[in-house]
A protein has these predicted regions:
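Post-cleavage N-terminal segment of exported redox proteins
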Residues: 2-88, 177-184
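Axial heme c-ligation environment in periplasmic c-type cytochrome domains
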Residues: 18-24, 92-94, 118-130, 148-173
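Short secondary-structure boundary micro-motifs
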Residues: 39, 47, 135, 150-151
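Secretory-pathway extracellular proteins and peptide precursors enriched for disulfide-bonded cysteines
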Residues: 42, 96-98, 151
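Solvent-exposed, acidic/flexible segments
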Residues: 50-58, 99, 118, 136, ...
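C-type cytochrome heme c attachment motif
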Residues: 63-73, 100-112, 124-127, 141-148, ...
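Secondary-structure transition/capping residues
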Residues: 72-76, 136, 154, 158
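Gly/Gly-Pro-rich "capping" loops immediately C-terminal to redox-active cysteine motifs
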Residues: 81-144
Length: 184
């Protein structure tokens, strides 16, 4: 009997439920979607002098690799990096809030020497120079391209697209690449 009463109640509710389709708006999201689409994969040429042994550049690359930034960031960025980044084309006035610069947080997916809490989604980058560069399996251009826009040889990659989206500058990508291939 309980089953019959329950089924009767369900049937009654479904017969008298309100039709809300006329009050729910359905905006055309095409423009929003187009704005969020990534530009096509872009092939980049590494600039001359990109890979460096300069300890300051390597320190900046390491900071970008190991940190995300934001309000909870604890470490102070090395000389030449800022916690804030002005957006191109935006005029700032005294007292305006300048947005935080987002760093790579590459460590969330990759392991590398000295990493704490490294991820395992992306390849392990430990001993990269010895394993890949010195052996001839990869070159510096490959490292630069993988950081700039990894979709060139892997269209379905989960890695962030950094130069094409302007998340990083060419200089920052060179510094990250210099850190990855540097002795640790």
């Amino acid at each position: 009997m309980n089953k019959i009463v329950f089924i009767s109640l369900l049937a009654g509710v479904s017969l008298f439920s309100a039709d809300y389709s006329s009050v729910i708006s359905s905006p055309n999201a095409s423009k929003l979607i187009q704005k969020d689409l990534l530009a096509p994969a872009t092939k980049y040429t590494m600039p001359a002098g990109c890979i460096t042994k300069d300890p300051n550049a390597i320190a900046r690359g390491a900071f970008i690799f190991h940190n995300l930034n934001g309000k909870k960031a604890k470490k102070k960025p090395p000389k030449g990096l800022s916690r804030k980044q002005m957006k191109p084309g935006v005029t700032y006035h005294q007292g305006d809030k300048i947005p935080a610069k987002q760093y790579g947080n590459c460590i969330a997916c990759h392991n590398i020497e000295g990493a704490h809490g490294a991820g395992n989604i992306g390849p392990d980058l430990s001993n990269y120079k010895k394993t890949y560069i010195d052996s001839g399996a990869r070159n510096y251009q490959f490292v630069f391209q993988k950081i700039a826009d990894p979709r060139i040889d892997n269209p379905k990659t989960n890695m962030t697209v950094n130069l094409t989206t302007k998340l990083f500058t060419t200089k920052e990508i060179c510094e990250i690449a210099s850190y990855i291939v540097s002795p640790k």
